Amino acid sequence: MEIQFNYESQEHHLLSDGENKTKIGKPASEEGITAKIEPLTEESSSLRENVLQDSEGREFCEFGDKLNEKDQNVFKRRPHNCDEYGQSFVWNTGLFRHRKTHCEKPYECDKCGKAFSVSSALVLHQRIHTGEKPYSCNWCIKSFSRSSDLIKHQRVHTGEKPYKCDECGKAFSQSSDLIIHQRIHTGEKPYQCSHCSKSFSQRSDLVKHQRIHTGEKPYTCNQCNKHFSQSSDVIKHQRIHTGEKPYKCDVCAKAFSQSSDLILHQRIHTGEKPYPCNQCSKSFSQNSDLIKHRRIHTGEKPYKCNECGKAFNQSSVLILHQRIHTGEKPYPCDQCSKTFSRLSDLINHQRIHTGEKPYPCNQCNKMFSRRSDLVKHHRIHTGEKPYECDECGKTFSQSSNLILHQRIHTGEKPYPCSDCTKSFSRRSDLVKHQRIHTGEKPYACNQCDKSFSQSSDLTKHQRVHSGEKPYHCNSCEKAFSQSSDLILHQRIHTGEKPYLCTQCSKSFSQNSDLIKHQRIHTGEKPYKCSECRKAFSQCSALTLHQRIHTGEKPNPCNECGKSFSRHSDLINHQKIHTGEKPYKCDACGKAFSTCTDLIEHQKIHAGEKPYRCVQCSRSFSQLSELTIHEEVHCGEDSQNVMNVRKPLVYTSTLFSTRDTVPGKNLMNAVDY
């Protein structure tokens, strides 16, 4: 582009400008001034401002190399020198205007009072107030207040990068970008913070840094009024509200709201980990991860909570911790009313609604909704247990399990219930417990109408529909739908009874059996019927009792359609159809279909007669015999029967359906 320049008119214009020292509210000839500054259009905005406010002579120096050969020769002759700064000028007027910059700023804005040493700078400044943007882009609808800004912008369309680094050959579209880039090679950091010893290569970085000291957050989100110290942060934040994800992965089409997230994501595909630790052999895909990792070696915890003094090695962990004190939960689910203190918790929660499980196990094809769950699951296959307890040496596959285990030694229960006096060592136990108070059952079965308070209960229940039994016994090949059932079953083979009663010498294979047994000693009956207020020591006994009031008989026979309130009654009934008599008398070899029939029969051999007639004091070994005898006493009240020794009632819980032999458990009968 050849620049046409009229030296005479320019010199005359500068002289007339120099003579006019009055305050300018309205420039006498804006067109003339605009024409004068157009040769500077190749300069960056930051440098241009310095040129216009420093000296007219420097202005000519900047564009002189764009002129033709004849005009360049004119610029080589610079007889007018500044004694103070040593600068040279082609014309006297240039030197005159330059000297004014040492002391004078005669051009003042009538809107805000800001003063300038040259009129052209005032003209540009006034466009801030007027909003005037006279320079339009031919490629798009954008307009600019300065021609230099237009030229820079047009390079977006043309791809022109005229400024090249001598060190590495990298090219830039703006000279200011080249200057900043060259500071990488020189190490120059000319912008120093007045509050601390930090220096910066860019002024904008210094401005951002100083907001750490001042606490200034000038950028506000118009959706939620959240404040930010950097404009880029508010732009990123607003994408939470809009859902915009403009950065897409070429490999898997996953989209991201931030370009930095895309770059990090792409390293999953490439496997690139460019940040190695110099203390150990670990490498990281993110520099921030390396910095965090190094604190493991140094033990540094630079982030301290103002509320409780607790220190953390990561700022993000401190922010999450502070939400315990503030109760802030800034991440709401758009499917339900739940809110979360962490974005990762929201993402994991949303997979409950979508059913998404993006993390497959390459050993067994099991799918997981969270990557951390996959990592934990892998340890089942590898047997790895990297977390060891300092107290007892026990090892764990998960760090969370070690932390929970250590609370056995310390007795710590940091999660108290706000509704009662109970405390818990695990937060998950508190959440489950609170559902007793609220009655919440958030986990619904999609096969039937049943709901559950815990997700694990739903998973177990769904196996009733699917028939899945993923847990196999190595000793007898028996399969179970629940891992807990397998563990209990394996104790049949091992004979293990790890739960000891402190009141007597009895041991139990299940903790639940110990708890039930201990109620014999305490007399506790915590389960009360809401209909008749009768109390029971076991929940299962209450459930069976309530069916007396409701008439519910949920156990139907497939052969004849007869229904029963108890599953054990159904099993006994089905033996009528099959003819099965698994209970044999040791004394005479007679077989019976139910255990109760065997017990009644054994009283004959023992000579036991617990049923006595109140009319004649005669005793009988079986209740049926007493009933027949009572018919002898005609007209007598057949209901005046005193059971000298109340007969034992046997339930399905007494003879565990989990592979135990009922004949060996006769002493486990309970009275309910």
From Swiss-Prot:
**Keyword set, alphabetical order:** DNA-binding, Metal-binding, Nucleus, Repeat, Transcription, Transcription regulation, Zinc, Zinc-finger
Asked whether the UniProt record includes DNA-binding among its keywords, one would answer: yes
Cellular compartment(s): Nucleus
Query: What are the start and end residues of every segment in region (Disordered)?
Result: 1-29
- The C2H2-type zinc finger ranges are 80-102, 107-129, 135-157, 163-185, 191-213, 219-241, 247-269, 275-297, 303-325, 331-353, 359-381, 387-409, 415-437, 443-465, 471-493, 499-521, 527-549, 555-577, 583-605, 611-633
Q: Where is the composition biased (Basic and acidic residues)?
A: 9-22
* A GO cellular component entry from the record: nucleus
GO molecular function terms noted in the UniProt entry? DNA binding; zinc ion binding
Q: What is its main location?
A: nucleus
**Pfam families documented for this protein:** zf-C2H2
State the disulfide connectivity. Answer: none
Record-linked PANTHER family = C2H2-TYPE DOMAIN-CONTAINING PROTEIN, ZNF44 PROTEIN
What role is this protein assigned?
May be involved in transcriptional regulation.
- Report the family membership: Belongs to the krueppel C2H2-type zinc-finger protein family.
Q: What is the protein name given in its UniProt record?
A: Zinc finger protein 271
Native species:
Pongo abelii (Sumatran orangutan)
